[in-house]
């Protein structure tokens, strides 16, 4: 069995444990990040609380005082043969969290490293089976990774250098869930890479972060994250969240609430979405009212026409980098060029081709469009592609 990939786990077990074992390039990156903290520091302990097969400790850190913990008995059995068994803990790292549990003195300078599990226990399991995150009450979250971040604060780690989804930071709702962690730690370095570096992840790639945090009583705000300069792995490019305008607050993403209009006056709905990844994965317009359907009206049709255009034509080489963001947009230009997106959608969307001609005429009239059937769709498409390219 390779020390950086647990071949004893089948796909279902990997999903349940949230475990994807780590390529050496990422392990080396973590080691480089923590090196300055290992110099001139006495009484330092390095801890991987979701250690798997020990990849993060074995390469270069075995000479330091360390601890490795994992809940998988087979991984623990393997690690115990490779390391000092007295420093290996086959336990759930999220239960009864305390330094004493891992024989870590209060006075020790604690550096936590690793690739903790991350998955949404409400949605990641197959066949309708729901996951259970067994942890201390103050660590509870539907995502295992968020619970691990909270556990680092409970252990009062001095340094945290781990891999985790970028979405934990760049989605404000997720950031707020970090609670005690964000209030006591500050991001110092962050390098983004694609999930495709991990063996066995799904078809939809998403951004993951090599993150270095220092314990800091001032913590960090979402505005700090919005303006943080993230690097991209093996690239000179940077990612700065505040440089991107999104549809948040401009286009509704979710089905109607109790007091909202429930039925579309033009018989059109748009499938709900969370971010770019879900927008591209899901269908677009639908003709029948549905629990996942957003009500489309004449007045907001152009916004969903823009979404359809974006879904279809936004395909940059590094699309994985933007997948967890809400759809990108230049609101001022979309308001100016409504007709462009409406016309493209009328001509290209298969559902719009099935709808009653009377509805198409209503839409065209509302937006003052001449629906010339001879007009070349490719020229409209190319114009939209140019505009979408300028968003990144």
Question: Across the structure, where does each feature detected by a protein language model lie?
Answer:
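Short amphipathic alpha-helix with an adjacent loop that forms part of the alpha/beta core around
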Residues: 95-108
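Internal, well-ordered alpha/beta segment that forms a basic, Gly-enriched binding/recognition surface
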Residues: 111-126, 145, 151-152, 160-161
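Short catalytic/ligand-binding loop motif for oxyanion handling, primarily in non-cytosolic enzymes
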Residues: 57, 119-123, 168-173, 220-221
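Flexible, glycine-/basic-rich loop-and-beta segments that form/coincide
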Residues: 204-264
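Class I S-adenosyl-L-methionine
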Residues: 1-80, 86-87, 92, 97, ...
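C-terminal target-recognition/interaction regions appended to catalytic cores
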Residues: 267-392
């Amino acid at each position: 069995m390779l020390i950086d990939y647990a071949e004893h786990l089948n796909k279902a077990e990997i999903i349940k444990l949230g475990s994807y074992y780590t390529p050496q390039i990422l392990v080396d990156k973590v080691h480089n990040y923590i090196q300055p903290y290992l110099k001139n520091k006495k009484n330092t302990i390095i801890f991987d609380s979701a250690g798997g097969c020990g990849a993060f400790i074995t390469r270069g850190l075995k000479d330091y005082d360390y601890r490795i913990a994992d809940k998988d008995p087979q991984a623990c059995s393997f690690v115990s043969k490779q390391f000092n068994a007295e420093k290996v803990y086959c336990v759930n790292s999220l239960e009864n969290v305390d330094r004493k549990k891992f024989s870590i003195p209060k006075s020790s300078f604690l550096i936590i490293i690793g690739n903790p599990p991350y998955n949404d226990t409400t949605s990641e399991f197959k066949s309708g089976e729901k996951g259970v995150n067994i942890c201390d009450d103050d660590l509870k979250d539907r995502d295992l990774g968020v619970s691990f971040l909270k556990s680092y604060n409970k252990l009062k780690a001095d340094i945290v250098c781990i891999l985790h989804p970028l979405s934990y930071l760049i989605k404000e709702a997720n950031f707020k869930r970090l609670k005690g962690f964000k209030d006591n730690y500050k991001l110092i370095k962050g390098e983004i890479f694609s999930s495709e570096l991990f063996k066995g992840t799904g078809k939809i790639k998403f951004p993951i972060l090599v993150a270095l945090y220092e314990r800091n009583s001032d913590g960090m705000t979402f505005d700090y994250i919005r303006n943080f300069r993230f690097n991209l792995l093996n690239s000179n490019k940077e990612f700065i969240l505040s440089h991107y305008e999104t549809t948040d607050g401009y286009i509704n993403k979710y089905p109607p609430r109790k007091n909202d209009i429930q039925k579309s006056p033009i018989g059109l709905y748009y499938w709900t979405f969370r971010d770019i990844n879900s927008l591209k994965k899901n269908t677009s317009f639908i003709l029948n009212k549905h629990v996942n359907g957003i009500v489309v009206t004449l007045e907001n049709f152009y916004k969903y026409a823009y979404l359809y255009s974006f879904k279809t034509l936004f395909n940059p080489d590094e699309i994985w980098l933007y997948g967890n963001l809400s759809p990108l947009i230049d609101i001022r230009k979309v308001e100016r060029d409504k007709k462009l997106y409406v016309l493209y959608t009328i001509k290209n969307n298969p559902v719009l081709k099935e709808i009653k001609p009377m509805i198409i005429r209503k839409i065209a009239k509302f937006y003052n469009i001449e629906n010339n059937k001879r007009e070349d769709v490719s020229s409209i498409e190319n114009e939209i592609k140019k505009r979408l390219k300028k968003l990144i």
